[in-house]
A protein has these predicted regions:
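N-terminal secretory signal peptides that target proteins for export/translocation
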Residues: 1-13
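Hydrophobic alpha-helical membrane-insertion segments, chiefly the h-region
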Residues: 27-29, 224
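Compositionally biased, low-complexity segments
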Residues: 2-5, 21, 32
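Residue-level detector of solvent-exposed, low-hydrophobicity positions
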Residues: 12, 25, 178-179
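Bacterial N-terminal signal peptides
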Residues: 17-27
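Expand to "…catalyze enediolate/carbanion chemistry for C-C bond making/breaking, isomerization
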Residues: 34-294
């Protein structure tokens, strides 16, 4: 962990840095080795290997990380902006080493199919869905990421992505046929290379959590304590009432063997390191560590 925050301190940009640490000791899936011509989603690869994966929410990752979340939640969504980031992430005109994930606009939460189709057709490796509050929204999220399934595949949730794949096969560096066999959500499809990250950010979402988790294909449940505080009238994300709800969600996820995530905001690398260790000890499997230190 010390080396992680040493890397953070070397970055001199003025924005906040977001590092995601996936500790996945509870997962027991068997490794599915990718063909040499296939892209590697390092989130999934590390999950299978029972190793942490490091990521960031910045558009221009400068460190040796496993993935980056391109944040499109705020402002006007523009697929061309995302495509430019994806091009910049390629290495020697080959599929990126850092797996690109996109957080979609909140306005697309209830009907994400069109936005998600554009993003997947561009070649992203996963989608983060903000403020999911119902089983129906979670189902729509997973369905939007799946092609219509063949008779011998899992039919639930049904795939609504459509029949085309855009430029994604070329971005991944695989054939159209290879892409279609790999472009499904993990862990519902153990060989899938797409990750669905579901954010729970309200009391309504927490109350519906058990129903939400009945939806197959969820890769990560990620908490939003600041928005949770706003939805409950608490003074802030560290309020005891918010912390109690955070622990409630964590216990549900642990019982269901689903990685649970939490964002840490720290004023120094040392504080971030301490909080990271504490949350990992509690059982969180995904941590977004934010530090304001320069």
């Amino acid at each position: 962990m010390k080396s992680l925050f040493s890397k953070m301190s070397q970055n001199k940009t003025t924005c906040l840095h977001f590092l995601l640490i996936l500790n996945v000791s509870v997962l027991s899936a068997t490794v599915v080795q990718a063909q040499s011509s296939s892209p590697v989603n390092r989130i999934i690869e590390n999950l299978f290997r029972d190793s942490p994966a490091l990521g960031t929410f910045t558009r221009t990752p400068e460190m040796d990380i496993d993935f980056t979340v391109i944040d499109e939640q705020y402002g006007e969504f523009d697929i061309n902006d995302v495509r430019k980031v994806l091009v910049d992430m390629r290495v020697n005109n080959r599929s990126p080493i850092v797996a690109p994930i996109v957080r979609i606009p909140l306005a697309a939460r209830d009907a994400p199919q069109d936005v998600v189709r554009q993003l997947l057709d561009a070649g992203v490796f996963g989608i983060m869905f903000p403020d999911i509050e119902t089983q129906e929204q979670a189902t729509a999220a997973i369905s939007s990421m799946r092609f219509p399934q063949t008779a011998d595949a899992d039919q639930v949730p049904p795939g609504l992505r459509g029949s085309g794949s855009g430029s994604a096969p070329g971005y991944w560096g695989v054939s159209e046929e290879e892409y279609r066999t790999q472009a499904d959500v993990w862990p519902l499809d153990p060989a899938g290379k797409l990750v669905a990250m579901i954010q729970i950010e309200s009391l309504t979402g927490i109350r519906a959590l058990n129903e939400i988790l009945e939806v197959p294909g969820i890769g990560v449940i990620f908490l939003g304590p600041t928005d949770l505080a706003n939805s409950t009238g608490a003074e802030g994300p560290n309020a005891p009432t918010v912390e109690a709800l955070v622990q409630e969600v964590l216990q549900v996820c642990l019982a269901r063997n689903i990685p649970c995530g939490y964002p840490i905001v720290a004023n120094s690398h040392q504080e971030a390191e301490r909080e990271t260790a504490r949350r990992l000890a509690e059982g969180f499997k995904v941590l977004a560590v934010m530090t304001r230190a320069q």
